[in-house]
């Protein structure tokens, strides 16, 4: 690379990733093969449109790549329809929402502070700006989704669309119950499985594909692919929907809202990376990987509990959990900064019914996907949890410096993918 400034910054980031314990639940490490595809000459090609229907010439091989990605996605998820063009999960959600409802319609989504996502109706996001939004949350007592309460809220607000899915909910989501609620109030159901896609395809979480009208996901996180989005559908893929005043099959509406509705040319180099990720996730080794992610995450959560920390909802069924720090002197922001000083990376996170602002937060979110990709097992994950607890309870900078040395020495033994 001739650009020394960028090269040196990339090298610094490479060293940071190697010498830090990565616990951000939305992050993971891709394979070298995926990185090679994303960094390939495919970035040169413009390919507006879809296979065999492009607005540019020279797309014959691009058509083959996208068709292969679609085929693998459908096989992996058991879907009848897949659009692999969304640049991100947020853009996948935007296109999916626009295919199902119109501006001014009503959306019922999960409260952001209870584990939802910005694109599920937040007032600062397109979903809350162009649509009328209502929210459900978790029970104050159990910190679990109360489906009876969701039904009650749905009957009160009569949404056109219900969004199921979360960014910081550590328990299994019952998508069938959400579909029953949606049918009860004549609403569409969109399931956002960005965080749990890997668990679903590996068989460790119930699938939304034949339950929801549309399912969206990112292709990174637990799926371990390149950064990007995807839209899927099962048995409802050809259901007729009212789109711009005309009846259209759902898949046609989605294709239109992705391109030209929300995007121009697809990122072909990323689509190639997605295709590789889907192939990797179809292997038996991926099921073993996800099983280990869940084991590692549970081990860490249980250790925190044994050390007197409260875990939101009491535990985890997936790849993440929230630690409640409200009884300590630390905010989530304090803990995030402190832990980064000892080479442990995670994020501050609001907890249900949080009294602190999101910029401070009362909790931290911990995920096990990335460390598992580096080969950490349950014993190693227990050591990670011990590092965190020691750092949170440290009384001096000398202690923190010692912990950092131990963290670096520990994590260097695990290769990057």
From Swiss-Prot:
It catalyses: (6R)-5,10-methylene-5,6,7,8-tetrahydrofolate + glycine + H2O = (6S)-5,6,7,8-tetrahydrofolate + L-serine. The record marks 220 as: Plays an important role in substrate specificity. One of its GO terms (biological process) is glycine biosynthetic process from serine. (6S)-5,6,7,8-tetrahydrofolate binds at residues 112, 116-118, 247. Keywords: Amino-acid biosynthesis, Cytoplasm, One-carbon metabolism, Pyridoxal phosphate, Transferase. Its EC number is 2.1.2.1. Pfam families: SHMT (PF00464). The modification N6-(pyridoxal phosphate)lysine is found at residue 221. The keyword Cell inner membrane does not apply. Its cofactor is pyridoxal 5'-phosphate. It is found in: Cytoplasm. Its main location: cytoplasm. GO terms for cellular component: cytosol. SUPFAM superfamilies: PLP-dependent transferases. InterPro entries: PyrdxlP-dep_Trfase, PyrdxlP-dep_Trfase_major, PyrdxlP-dep_Trfase_small, Ser_HO-MeTrfase, Ser_HO-MeTrfase-like, Ser_HO-MeTrfase_PLP_BS, SHMT-like_dom. Signal peptide: none annotated. Pathway: One-carbon metabolism; tetrahydrofolate interconversion; Amino-acid biosynthesis; glycine biosynthesis; glycine from L-serine: step 1/1. The keyword Amino-acid biosynthesis applies. GO terms for molecular function: glycine hydroxymethyltransferase activity; pyridoxal phosphate binding. It comes from the Bacteria. Homodimer. Belongs to the SHMT family. This is Serine hydroxymethyltransferase. It comes from Borreliella burgdorferi (strain ATCC 35210 / DSM 4680 / CIP 102532 / B31) (Borrelia burgdorferi). The gene is glyA.
